[in-house]
Amino acid sequence: MPKVSQLASYLVYSYENHTGARFGDNELRLQTMLYFAQRECLAVVGVPLFEGSFEGWEEGPVLPELHFFFEEGYDPFEPLEMKKLTEREQFILDRVVFAYGQYEGWYLSDLARRETSWRNSRPSVAEEVTEPKLLELADIREDAKKVRIYDTLFDVYLDELEEFEGGVLEP
């Protein structure tokens, strides 16, 4: 599995490449988009995109190791580094950029705080308390079950497709 910082750098690269806009140093957007990437990977392939645990902060899910990503460790992703990430990893991050890249960090945070995994990490935490608990991977898996997977090639949600009962076509 890649380091989460590599995935974060690629996510910023993908955002800037696909939107033509600068990502800036919006840590809230980065953190929530990585949460959605983890959830998306669980929905699509059934395994986590990366190791590491999110904490349930007041603002939403946070990976502590990326808390000062832009201030301390941000290295812009170089296209030559593509081979460090699998096609699956790039695909998942690109999907998240297409689905959520248009939104501001606070809106994404609001979406993430509606997730069962975040709510379960803060069951009795008063809003002013900043003692975060971990988001359980099992809870993120439950959130992933609610994700509708969209096929951009066929412009349809996969759950709307009729089951294919034929054989594989030969060229």
Residue ranges and their predicted role:
Residues 1-171:
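Domain-edge interaction signal
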